[in-house]
Amino acid sequence: MSSTVSATPADPTKGMRKNGKNWHDNKKPFRPNAGLTSYEKRLEARKHQEAVKEHERELKEEKEAERKAHIQRIKERRAAKEEKERYEKMAEKMHRKRVERLKRKEKRNKLLNS
């Protein structure tokens, strides 16, 4: 007979537990996601997240621009209405031709000032 004993490498013993409960399994660190995602996958996920954020930012800017344009239209409409009412009040007191001359004069001044 030949002595061919298969020498399986045994787990190195870690020694006795401090609390003496040697019948329990040794605890391992709880890291369920450690090493599961590769660096490339993380980079890809980060890129995707940045693209989503950029898209959201663009949508927000577009919405804000629409809101500001709407507010500007309302302000212009109100200003035109006030100007019209002011000219109507002036027309009650003055002659129509004089009011038209004043309108033209004010428009010229407005163009020069802007």
From Swiss-Prot:
Subcellular location: Nucleus, Nucleolus
Protein origin, superkingdom: Eukaryota
GO cellular component: nucleolus
Protein's GO biological process: rRNA processing
Region spans: Disordered: 1-114
Compositional bias per record (Basic and acidic residues), positions renumbered to this chain: 39-93
Keywords: Coiled coil, Nucleus, Ribosome biogenesis, rRNA processing
InterPro entries: Cgr1-like
Ranges in coiled-coil conformation: 39-101
Family annotation (Pfam families): Cgr1
Bias-annotated ranges (Basic residues): 94-114
Family of this protein: Belongs to the CGR1 family.
Job description of the protein: Involved in nucleolar integrity and required for processing of the pre-rRNA for the 60S ribosome subunit.
Record's protein name: rRNA-processing protein cgrA
Gene that this sequence comes from: cgrA
